[in-house]
Amino acid sequence: MTAPDEKTLATLTKLFEEEFGPIGNRQVLYVHAPGRSEISGNHTDHEGGHVIAGSLDVAVDGIAVATDTNKIRVADEGYPTFEITLDTLDIQASEKGTSASLVRGMAHEIAALGVEPQGFDFAFTCSVPSGGGLSSSAAVEAAYGRAMETLWGAPAIEPVALAQMSQRTENNYYDKPCGLMDQAAVCLGGLAYMDFEDQAQPKTQKLELNFEDHGYALVLVKVGADHVAATDDYAAVPREMQDVAAEFGKARLCEVNVADFDAKLPELRAKLGDRACLRAVHYWYENGLVDKRWAALNAGDIDQFLVLTRESGASSAMYLQNVVAKLGSEQPSMYALALAEHVLDGRGAVRIHGGGFGGTIQAFVPLDLVDTFIAKMNGWLGEGSARHYAISDKGAYAAWL
């Protein structure tokens, strides 16, 4: 585990002491949880499908100090400090959709391991952009989990198990639907392939790979529309996919035989409509593209990876339909995709990123074009919209300083 650099530690210490008073000679716990980028597998995780994701060089960084209270106090740079009491760890309806719900939910999960919850103060900074599809909420959940695991003396928690705790917290306490990919990527670190068919024990593989070594930069571009505002559009994707699965007596599309789907298509279309059927078509097509892209990356075949990524982007736009939230004159994601394609001029690849309906697009940009690409996208969409990211090999962890 790596300690924070001097600048990060100084920032965290200043924030902590401004909010909670001097640390003195008390023991300090450092916590780190990265953001993530979905590399392959657009809306496949919630159907038990396959995903490739990478943790990024942006993160939640925090320090925690135990107290003799029954309160957890949290200082998040740039936001009001808040606290929860540990009198009850049950879901609080008044906290849904708030940061406090994530603390209480993770406390419930860690306490369920058989440890006694104890108070602590936690100050953190977050360089993961919120509402941009880089999973800032998953990083925060994982950071709370690693802090509680260590401070409360819980048994060591495997990355996938911590991810499942974080997912339950987001689903039940924060009250937002999500698959497991975001949390798993944050907890695993590096570039990882995930198979979610077995929800209890997802299969994972990791690969050491740096896109820059193959001549490309991973660039994410904020489109100027927060995907948080499109929660209903997002929620409709798994709902419609699972409506299709339900017609076969199944819960998720991974449990449905594609040949059975083909045979029943006219009936499904008449009952569920075109979009639900199109989204199911995307699931199977994209799932296959994930496996092909993982094989290409393992073989070091970046050209084939890019061809398949372009196919994936087309499927998301045409069949999954998570690029445009509501038809009308404002289409920020489609606009950003068009501009990116214009600059790339047939090179690299670009696709919608993550949940879609706003947030970010993802581009793999030739290194000789990356400065021009970022400058042009920033000129069109606003300074800071486009950023070059690197894959980080560290998943969520905590370490005593």
Could you describe each region identified by the protein language model?
Residues M1-R36, D61, V65-K96, Y193-R351, ...:
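C-terminal nucleotide
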Residues M1-V51, I84-D213, V370-F373, H388, ...:
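Gly/Ser-rich oxyanion-binding loop with an adjacent helix/lid
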Residues H50-T69, L188:
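Structural signature of FAD isoalloxazine-binding scaffolds in flavoprotein oxidoreductases
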Residues S55, S99, S329:
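Short, conserved glycine- and acidic-residue-centered signature motifs
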Residues G131, A295, T360:
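Short, flexible active-site loop motifs that bind/organize anionic cofactors or intermediates
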Residues F357:
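Glycine-rich phosphate-binding loop
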